[in-house]
């Protein structure tokens, strides 16, 4: 570890925190202190990820801010207050960045790090008590055989980058963390229609880890939860489907074990 501090700029969407987790951990070992930015809505998950690393400092944006780049006023404030620091950036902090397919590898290229370093940092800080509490509440309604499904539908806010809705045909109850999956279906007599409650919503997506690991099936779009999946133990999940046109196997080799469902074609 050297005596320099590091301001590390990377994209702030929820999934980016998992994509860039290895880079933060790497820099945490190299620098005396590492300063990263976080959207207000992601604060609980990001704080949990790094709470065991005293030299990782998280700067949280205003509650109304929802851009994937850190606010310039906070960046400038950091630069003026932190002595002996370097600024390291990835993504669109460089206006020439190529955000086409495979952008995740280019994030690491910008940092002069091999993308394979991600496989060296696959441990994340989990809160078993919170996970089990949420799991028990949900399976108390849905039962122990259920589908975990996630796309960009959310009753709390509208995502700025909407993905096509994910639909499945199954007799198993479908749990969506951010909306009643059955609320948009015409048949309100569906036996699973009234299982969901907004009380099952958590402001920390890490709370769903146990629920995901114990699900019968997983169906997700390329989103924050798909970025979380490589960190979980999914060996007992009978079916895993991701709905995307991206080359997700290059994102993480674990997706070789998934059904990759093309969308919009």
What do the PLM-derived regions correspond to, one by one?
Residues 1-265:
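Catalytic machinery of carbohydrate-active enzymes
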């Amino acid at each position: 570890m050297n005596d320099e501090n590091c301001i590390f700029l990377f994209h702030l969407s929820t999934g980016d925190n998992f994509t860039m987790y290895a880079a933060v951990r790497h820099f945490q070992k190299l620098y005396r202190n590492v300063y990263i930015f976080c959207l207000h809505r992601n604060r609980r998950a990001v704080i949990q990820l790094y709470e065991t690393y005293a030299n990782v400092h998280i700067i949280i944006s205003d509650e109304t801010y929802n851009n994937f780049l850190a606010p310039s006023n906070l960046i400038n404030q950091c630069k003026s207050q932190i002595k002996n620091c370097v600024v390291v950036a990835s993504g669109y902090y460089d206006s020439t960045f190529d955000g086409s397919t495979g952008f995740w590898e280019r994030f690491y290229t910008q940092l002069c790090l091999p993308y394979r370093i991600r496989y060296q940092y696959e441990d994340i800080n989990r809160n078993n008590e919170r996970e089990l509490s949420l799991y028990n509440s949900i399976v108390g309604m849905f039962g122990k055989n259920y589908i975990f499904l996630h796309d960009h539908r959310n009753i709390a806010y509208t995502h700025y980058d909407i993905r096509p809705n994910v639909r499945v045909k199954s007799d198993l109850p479908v749990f969506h963390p951010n909306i009643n999956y059955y609320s948009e279906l015409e048949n309100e007599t569906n036996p699973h229609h009234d299982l969901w409650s907004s009380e099952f919503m958590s402001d920390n997506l890490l709370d769903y880890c146990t629920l995901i690991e114990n699900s019968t099936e997983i169906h997700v779009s390329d989103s924050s939860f798909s970025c979380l999946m490589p960190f979980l133990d999914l060996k007992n999940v009978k079916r895993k489907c991701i709905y995307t046109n991206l080359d997700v196997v290059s994102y993480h080799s674990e997706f070789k074990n998934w059904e990759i469902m093309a969308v919009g074609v």
